[in-house]
Amino acid sequence: RFFTKPISLEILKSALASAIATRETIKNKYTREIDYGYGDIKMNNADNQLATKVIAIIRKNIENTEFSVEELSREVGMSRVHLNRKLKEMMNISPSNLIRSIRLKQAAYLLINNKVNISEVAYKVGFSTHSYFSNSFHDYFGMTPKEFTAQYMNCTDEETLKKIFG
């Protein structure tokens, strides 16, 4: 939004409050919906509950660098092979790729919304090394974390954010 000079303090305060409110609304929406993008696949109630449980377990363990498909299957209560088969059937994604996808989407969210350096984000989402995180991020988003941050840091366009996190 552009303003003509001289600018009234009330107009400036109003514009800032509106921009902050819009940013908070988008932030809250995408915090809740960050791991969506698999929901458009038709699932019965039991499958939906399983998918919700799997995603919740992954999010709970997102900072754990040792979290693996074996640990996920143990927490879900089914064999690794059966969990792999179910997730492929329900969401068309393997458990390891689902874990990586959720971690990388959370990393993207942190890079856009927090003033946190890239190494810190890598550890917050469960990557043990900065280089592995950067390579995985580049493979997933098609750009480095630094390029991503530069491009989307002040983005408030809902459609663009939906493409990133959807």
Regions inferred by a protein language model and the residue ranges of each:
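C-terminal output helix
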Residues: I7-L16
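Short, hydrophobic alpha-helical segments
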Residues: L16-E24
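Terminal helix-turn-helix DNA-binding modules in bacterial transcription factors
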Residues: E89-S128, A150-G166
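Basic, amphipathic alpha-helical hairpins
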Residues: I55-F67, L87, M91, A108-N117, ...
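CheY-like receiver
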Residues: R23-K53
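Basic/polar phosphate-binding segments, predominantly the helix-turn-helix DNA-binding elements
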Residues: V69-I99, A122-E147
